Amino acid sequence: MQRYDYLKAIAADAADIKDALVVSTGWASREWWAVRPSDGNLKTRTLGLVSSIAAGLAIALPQRKVIAIDGDGAFLMNLCGLPTIAKQSPGNFIHLLFDNEIYEASGGTATASRHADAVVLAKGAGYRNATWVKSLEEFRVEFVRAWQHNELTLIAVKVEPGQPKDLPPLKLDEIENKYRFMRYLEATEKKGILNPGFDSKL
C-alpha cells in the first residue's frame, strides 16, 4: 500500500482531526492537502525539519493535537532531534513515519533506512511509545490509540513508493503557507503571532 492510503484512513478515523496541526514535507504534503485541505497544514521544504517543528508546536500548544508526517530520508536527517523530542515528551504529538526506502521527491535515490530500524532508533533516543505496523488495520488501531491517549507516539510503516495519478497540485508556496498557518493559529488560539497587539475580534 502507498502512503496516501494510510493518510486517507486516519483522516476518516479521527473525527476531530480537522483541528489538528499537521507538519509535512515532500509529496506527503500534497497528499495530505488532498485529504484534508486546511490552513492548519504546514509544509516544510527542508528534509529533517518536520519532527522538530511539530514537536515545538506541540510543546507551545499543549491543548492541540500535532501530527508530523515524516519520511525515512527526513527522519534519518534529524536523528539528533529525537532525544530532545523524547526529553520534552509532548503527549499531544503523534509522529508518523512512512518508510518507502527512497528520497521520492528528489528522484528516487535509495535512503539508508533498509539498514536501520527507525523504531529501535526512536526507543534508544527515549521514545516510550514507538512501534512498527504491518497493515492498514494495525496502523488505524495504533493511530486511534495515540489520538485518544496523551502520550508521545511514533508509528512507523513500510509503504510502496508512488502517488495517485490524479493528485491535485498545491496552489500555494511555502511563504504563503507560512503566513496562512500563522494567521490560522492567531484566529484559533486568539493570540497574536505576527502582531503582538492582535485583536481576535477584528
Show where each model-derived region lies.
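Generic beta-sheet signal
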Residues: 19-21, 64-68, 93, 149-157
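Active-site diphosphate/adenylate-binding microenvironment
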Residues: 1-47
